[in-house]
Amino acid sequence: MIPDVSQALAWLEKHPQALKGIQRGLERETLRVNADGSLATTGHPESLGSALTHKWITTDFAEALLEFITPVDGDIDHMLTLMRDVHRYTARQLGDERMWPLSMPCYIEQGQDIELAQYGTSNIGRLKTLYREGLKNRYGALMQTISGVHYNFSLPMAFWQAKCGETDKEAISAGYFRLIRNYYRFGWVIPYLFGASPAICSSFLQGKPTTLPFEKTDCGMYYLPYATSLRLSDLGYTNKSQSNLGITFNDLHEYVAGLKRAIKTPSEEYETIGLEKDGKRLQINSNVLQIENELYAPIRPKRVTRSGEAPSDALERGGIEYIEVRSLDINPFSPIGVDEQQIRFLDLFMVWCVLADAPEMSSDELLCTRTNWNRVILEGRKPGLTLGIGCETAQFPLAKVGKDLFRDLKRVAQTMDSLYGGEEYQKVCDQLVESFDNPELTFSARILRSMIDQGIGGTGRTLAAQYRDMLQQEPLEVLSEEDFVAEREASIARQREVEAGDTESFEAFLAKHA
């Protein structure tokens, strides 16, 4: 089931320097909650500066949904330490509030008014809030409070020069699309190993019927005994109306055209919401996607955008610059929601995905890959579970496929370790491969044991309090208090500048973006 990568691995072993200069970045979302686990109803703390323009600390869907961002970094340890510093500083600014350590929210009641993230009075700030209003009206606010971690990854120019003999945008984009196709085919390994949302609070179902065979604890927790990541399931944030958009990952121009088409495709379902009610705007437009970011995807091709530029225009201009992996649940065993082992695994898996042969993929096959993901998401730890290839009928044991994959990853790890020194990458392979023979070692199995014992609420509250105390007590390491104060002031000044620079009404601005 695994493609033959022996030739590509032999090439890599001869060209280890091609991997020198891998760049990464992290984004972590987390809800601000009170000591009892309920959602904080306070505004974004003033001491954290402007959520519109701060370079490390912003908000996602809700005013209480923090998002922490690291700059692009070539050093894993430095990136994780900076992320920890952002958590340490924030923990000291939150008073008695703390950061929810799980992907799935718990203490949010049906119909509770969740305040949307606010970004000030500028046109762009108001558009961001209106986009969130649209998300709320389309999918419900609760779905939008699910948190995750995003891992951004790029290969150095030296890799593309050595592998393709050229570094033009077409060659590099083709290489990243190969990575993406392999990710769709084999990325289910990420929720298998690191999925950490095998259960939900009953409030999350909002009284709606479900076809999933949930088991229920006395405290009202719903769980699937072999599930890995309900965050990635249809219970989480997936958009069924997007499944037939026909967006594919074979060619840059084809992908961009598909994305632009989706933005302009009207949706009967969303037309029924309307654009305005009682003078209040309800969504940017009634198309399948209000803006490109609404496209649900476990992985995205990206390029840093210029001011006012749409993501697809940036891709068309310069090709793919980096990849955003979006399938990581919050790691509940880390105060910062992610750890070094995960980053090293993702490095290895990304390199494998770009090396392994990846035939072009029709939109039909793309839908078929969802079958494997769903199996792993809902019953990944089930003994004897099998997976298929694309739309074919042949089935293969997950445990065997996983071990075959890790045989390849071990060779990539040896190359990475020879380049960077030490044996850290190989150690990660040795630790994680055991999870295929013993699923109890996976994140989902470990956290489910705690949840069955304490409930989701109890587990979340205990970890939130523990991490709050830990982070508040730890000294800052790579950033200083002065850095945070300076960035707070600078971000507020940047927001004021944006607001002062607006030259047109919001209506005129919106007309250009709708």
Curated annotation (Swiss-Prot):
Keywords: ATP-binding, Glutathione biosynthesis, Ligase, Nucleotide-binding. One of its GO terms (cellular component) is cytosol. Pathway: Sulfur metabolism; glutathione biosynthesis; glutathione from L-cysteine and L-glutamate: step 1/2. It comes from the Bacteria. It is an enzyme of class 6 (ligase). Its EC number is 6.3.2.2. GO terms for molecular function: ATP binding; glutamate-cysteine ligase activity; metal ion binding. Belongs to the glutamate--cysteine ligase type 1 family. Type 1 subfamily. HAMAP family: Glu_cys_ligase. This is Glutamate--cysteine ligase. It comes from Enterobacter sp. (strain 638).
